[in-house]
Amino acid sequence: EFKSPTALSLAILAGFLPQFVLGLFAGVYVDRWNRKKTMFYSDLFIAFCTLCLFIVITKGYKDLSFFYLLTACRSIGSTFHAPALQASIPLLIPKHHLVRVSGLYHSIQSFSEVIAPVVGASLVVWLPIQYILLIDVIGAVAACLTLLCVQIPSLQKTKVLPDFKKELTECWHTLRRTMGILPLFVCFTLVTFVLMPVFTLFPFMTLLHFNGNILQ
């Protein structure tokens, strides 16, 4: 609606930056929290933020700061949900099936990342954006209801407070000791920062420069 590459870039930055910053520390807390509750409340928080986005769009608010704030809040919820989900897999799966299930999990996740934009782009043609957001809310609520039916074993609680410096140092040493991991991590980070602004321009190139339509 605003036809502003800057606005879209800022929205994507608002969705990425909290994960980049908080992701360094989220795992420290997730390892000490109840995984099931962490995922449950993260999903509820994401659903609440998405519902607020639905209301903001439906009411016709034009102040983009609302969108940036709610997008950043959704990103914060995802920052804690993702490591809690990954940390729950070893608690649910027998050790001899762990490699196979982990591979299936990442395959499904990769498939979702590919198919979701296709489905989303198709829905944009037929539905207003606010109703597409409602689908996301329904999905988050369904995930919460599913979690209520799943029993995730709890780890023994510890009273030791997180030592960020120690754990980050151990993480850094592990990255350096494992051959190929550190260069891969650096390359992935650099590629993400370089390509993200470029990807945001593709819709505008299609609509404004090539005079395409939403479906294209």
Where are the model-predicted features located?
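Juxtamembrane intracellular "pre-TM" segments in multi-pass secondary transporters
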Residues: 152-186
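Loop-to-transmembrane helix entry
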Residues: 4-14, 209-216
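A single, central transmembrane helix in multi-pass transporters
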Residues: 126-134, 173-216
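Helix-to-coil boundary motifs at intracellular loop junctions of multi-pass secondary transporters
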Residues: 1-2, 32, 88-92, 205-210
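Helix-loop junctions on the cytosolic side of multi-pass membrane transporters
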Residues: 60, 87-92, 129-163
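Substrate-agnostic recognition of the 12-TM MFS/MFS-like secondary transporter fold
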Residues: 12-30, 34-49, 66-125, 135, ...
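Primarily residues marking transmembrane-helix entry/exit sites
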Residues: 5, 64, 68, 167, ...
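C-terminal ends and interior cores of transmembrane alpha-helices
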Residues: 44-61
